[in-house]
Design a protein with these regions (language model features):
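The AdoMet/dcAdoMet-binding core of the Class I SAM-like
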Residues: 2-13, 60-194, 204-214, 311-313
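Short catalytic-loop micro-motif centered on adjacent basic/acidic residues
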Residues: 88, 196-198, 226
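Short strand-turn motif at the edge of the Rossmann-like AdoMet-binding core
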Residues: 165, 198-202, 229
């Protein structure tokens, strides 16, 4: 391309469809491990800061992760208004628990992640993301299979956040996007509680995966709302699903949300506020149409398998 200059010698190419690749230039590899569960890179990029890559798929980059994590965490906590106990499934970088700990109502956060090697690497190389949240006395970190913990625990939660890597066939997460898994979450959810699930991209070529996840959640919860937020390092907007057996207000008054955040959190937001929350709760028409026409329910016998991984070149 005339006038362009490619400055990186190393690239990570993520296959987002069978026809499309999204590429980030890498300036430095900070860590690499092939754990029992997945292949991990922590890298420095030319434009998006440090990034975590699992099985070739970008998880978070320091420049724009605040968008993803504020959109993932705060809609459910705002809906509850007085969250005290929060369960996080996944969340290896620690940014999810960082956001939860903004709330002065929080008494306990339990984070369950299957891959302790990834968590330790993130603790070492991504302090910008976790900001020492793992050291907070309210946080309990458990390295284990979430399904096994959910089968045996008697603890219950006001908020559950499912912040898992995409369910690609070779990865550890695909059983955790099924009706059986979501029913386990419902069992340990307090009355009036909320579940937030990262629910994949919502670009028109990929919206079917998001719609099928929402359909699966609707087989478990009385109320499920599709949300989305722009995520530049992913190359497209990302979807979430807010779930509850209680009502979900999709038309909050921005000034009341701003007052709640001022009273009950320590602030410091860069993405979420009352106006932004109102915006991301307005699901685009094509997404609503895809959800309305979808009847698939993912099960352990027929789990989801999102497309693709990526390569280093």
């Amino acid at each position: 391309m005339s006038g362009s200059e490619l400055k990186a010698d190393l690239w990570i190419n993520e296959y987002i469809t069978s026809w499309d690749i999204y590429t980030h230039g890498v300036t430095k590899i900070l860590a690499y491990q092939k754990t029992p569960y997945q292949e991990m890179y922590i890298v420095e990029t030319g434009a998006f800061g440090k990034g975590l890559v699992l099985d070739g798929k970008w998880q978070s980059c320091t420049v724009d992760e605040f968008i993803y994590h504020e959109a993932l965490v705060h809609p459910g906590l705002i809906a509850h208004q007085n969250p005290r106990r929060v369960l996080v499934l996944g969340g290896g970088e620690g940014a999810t628990i960082r956001e939860i700990l903004r709330w002065n109502t929080i008494e306990k956060v339990m984070m369950i992640d299957i891959d302790g090697e990834v968590v330790e690497a993130c603790k070492q190389h991504l302090p910008e993301m976790h900001q020492n949240a793992f050291d907070d006395p309210r946080v309990e970190l458990i390295i284990a299979d979430a399904l096994k913990i959910l089968d045996t625990t008697e603890e219950t939660w006001d908020i559950i956040i499912s912040d898992l890597s995409d369910p690609i066939e070779s990865g550890p997460s695909f059983p955790l996007f099924t009706k059986e898994y979501f029913a386990k979450l419902q069992r340990v959810l307090n009355p009036g509680g909320y579940v937030m699930v990262q629910a994949g991209p919502i670009s028109p070529p990929e919206v079917g995966d998001h719609a099928r996840l929402v359909s699966t959640l609707k087989a478990v919860f009385n109320n499920v709302i599709s949300l989305s937020a722009p995520t530049p390092s992913y190359g497209r907007s990302w979807g979430f699903a807010l779930c509850s057996d209680a009502a979900i207000n999709t038309n909050p008054q921005p000034e009341l949300i701003d007052s709640l955040l001022s009273d009950k959190t320590k602030g410091g937001y860069r993405f979420i506020d009352g106006m932004t929350l109102l915006g991301i709760l307005q699901t685009p028409l094509y997404v609503r149409q895809a959800i309305a026409s979808e009847t698939t329910v993912y099960t352990l016998n027929e789990p989801p398998k999102f497309f693709g991984t990526g390569t280093m070149t």
